[in-house]
Amino acid sequence: MARIAGVNIPNHQHTEIGLTAIFGIGRTRSRSICSAAGVEFSKKVKDLTDADLEKLREEVGKFIVEGDLRREVTMNIKRLMDLGCYRGVRHRKGLPMRGQRTRTNARTRKGPRRAAQALKK
């Protein structure tokens, strides 16, 4: 298994698909990394030479990926919450922040339904 950016890339996959195992790299960025490194993206990871892997590591190093990207996203959300802007408040309350309806639906963001309380008469 090749190790790039602290992630083990599966040997049996094509380079284009294997690079997507790294957080922050999708198919498009994977293709651009392969072309910039001069590596054929249809080549299997196990068939890559050490020189190819080094070129890929160098190209991936130009982007913010894995832990740094996760930290940046978390800090961006925290900044919104500290500002007290609309999006930050919605993050804090655990509600959708992009204008979706919440009277019904929004179950993914709100979590499972709570049991209804019995009314006393």
From Swiss-Prot:
Positions of the region Disordered?
93-121
Question: Which terms are listed as keywords in the entry?
Answer: Ribonucleoprotein, Ribosomal protein, RNA-binding, rRNA-binding, tRNA-binding
Q: Which domain of life is it from?
A: Bacteria
Question: What is an example of a Pfam family matching this protein?
Answer: Ribosomal_S13
Biological processes, Gene Ontology terms: translation
Record's InterPro entries?
Answer: Rbsml_uS13_C (IPR027437), Ribosomal_uS13 (IPR001892), Ribosomal_uS13-like_H2TH (IPR010979), Ribosomal_uS13_bac-type (IPR019980), Ribosomal_uS13_CS (IPR018269)
Entries under HAMAP family matching the protein? Ribosomal_uS13
- Hey, which family's this protein in? Belongs to the universal ribosomal protein uS13 family.
Q: What does this protein do?
A: Located at the top of the head of the 30S subunit, it contacts several helices of the 16S rRNA. In the 70S ribosome it contacts the 23S rRNA (bridge B1a) and protein L5 of the 50S subunit (bridge B1b), connecting the 2 subunits; these bridges are implicated in subunit movement. Contacts the tRNAs in the A and P-sites.
On assembly, the entry states:
Part of the 30S ribosomal subunit. Forms a loose heterodimer with protein S19. Forms two bridges to the 50S subunit in the 70S ribosome.
UniProt-recorded name of the protein: Small ribosomal subunit protein uS13
The organism encoding this protein is: Burkholderia vietnamiensis (strain G4 / LMG 22486) (Burkholderia cepacia (strain R1808))
